[in-house]
Design a protein with these regions (language model features):
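Short loop/turn segments that connect beta-strands within beta-propeller blades
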Residues: 64-67, 120-124, 168-172, 222-226, ...
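Short glycine/acidic-enriched loop and turn motifs that connect beta-strands
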Residues: 51-56, 106-111, 153-158, 210-214, ...
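Residue position within the beta-strands of beta-propeller blades
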Residues: 48, 103, 150-151, 207, ...
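Cytoplasmic C-terminal tails of single-pass
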Residues: 307-322
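Short coil/turn segments that connect the beta-strands within blades of beta-propeller domains
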Residues: 43-45, 97-99, 144-146, 201-203, ...
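Selective detector of the "anchor" transmembrane alpha-helix that sits immediately C-terminal
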Residues: 282-303
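A short beta-strand motif characteristic of beta-propeller blades
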Residues: 25-30, 68-83, 125-131, 173-188, ...
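Repeated scaffold domains used in trafficking and secretory/extracellular systems
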Residues: 28-41, 78-93, 133-143, 183-197, ...
Length: 322
């Protein structure tokens, strides 16, 4: 076990650099270092991959709560944690129960074939290797880790057009066809992932995308039912500053500015867009009333003081003291 200081320094540096490097979005890629992927079962536990300096990879466990790093198994080859978004989104690839971790080659999706490691974080030496012809990157896992969703790109030179595929981890087979919104006519999707959020049980994965034209849409992926829905959004040039969250027990997808100001809501299931009503500014009204009362009180005190001085002067004149 090593102390966490050095690793945290690297993680902080990665978080500082990430927003600048990823502000415009980009393909899902595999990253080493940083904060890795967080456990859903054990708060404060993160899995991070780092180079061993000899062409291999170390899988480390960060225990943020206790300030420690546990060095895990040494893996042959270079592997990273799947990562996407604008620098604010955590790593991907860990199942909801924490028993399955997906690692990807850092060369993906810029080269073919595409390589992935799938296994228990505690026994990654025994992980199975998935090798696919073509240009793929990781997208999501179903809650029971039976399905791995992948992004298949048109080519390594064209990462803005792609389709979503599903790989059956039980049969070790890439399933035919694509996972797409049946109401859409496009043969491929187009856009760069900006940020995402996942439902409490891990079934639904909502990803905010920006098209090459600048238009935005949310890709709602049902990882259990192997279905997808695309919700077109109003054009917004500042998508890098948008955060996603789920409300009303997962029934509402809220898109908010990182300042906390709401932008719009999407109703899960119907996919209807609505705009939050502006709340009455009671805080500002209260502050204004308070300031007005303070001014009135100050004015009354000043008037009383001046009145008292006038009375004293008048009394002095009456007594001939002036």
């Amino acid at each position: 076990m090593r102390r966490l200081a050095l690793c945290l320094a690297v993680a902080v540096a990665a978080l500082v650099a990430a927003p600048a490097a990823l502000a415009a979005g980009g393909p899902v890629f595999a990253a080493q270092g940083g904060t890795g992927v967080a456990s859903h079962v054990h708060p404060g536990i993160h899995y991070v991959t780092v180079s061993d300096g000899r062409g291999g990879t170390l899988l480390e466990t960060l225990d943020v709560a206790h300030g420690a790093v546990f060095e895990g198994p040494a893996l042959r080859g270079s592997w990273g944690i799947p990562t996407l978004g604008n620098g604010y989104t955590a790593g991907q690839g860990l199942s909801r129960d924490g028993r399955t971790l997906v690692l990807a080659s850092p060369a993906s999706p810029y080269s073919a074939p595409s390589r992935f490691l799938v296994g228990d974080p505690g026994r990654m030496r025994a992980a199975r290797k998935v090798v696919l012809d073509g240009t793929f990157s990781f997208d999501a896992l179903s809650p029971d880790a039976s399905k791995m969703y992948l992004i298949q790109y048109a080519s390594a030179r064209n990462l803005s057009h792609y389709i979503v595929r599903v790989y059956d981890l039980r049969t070790n087979r890439l399933m035919p066809g694509k996972i797409a919104d049946r109401s859409e006519d496009e043969k491929t999707m187009a856009g760069s992932p900006m940020t995402r959020t996942t439902s409490a049980g891990g079934r639904w994965v909502y990803t905010l995308y920006q098209k090459p034209s600048g238009e935005a849409f949310v890709h709602a992926l049902d990882t259990v039912g192997a279905a997808a829905y695309c919700i077109d959004l109003p054009k917004n040039r500042a998508l890098y500053n948008i955060a996603l969250s789920l409300r009303d027990h997962g029934r509402t997808l809220a898109l908010r500015w990182r300042s906390g100001r709401p932008w719009l809501n999407v109703a899960a299931g119907t996919w209807e867009i609505s705009y939050p009503r502006a709340r009455f500014p009671w805080t500002w009204v209260g502050a204004g009333i308070g300031a007005a009362l303070a001014l009135l009180a100050g004015g009354a005190l000043l008037l009383r003081r001046r009145r008292s001085e006038e009375l004293e002067q008048h009394s002095g004149n009456e007594l001939g003291l002036a």
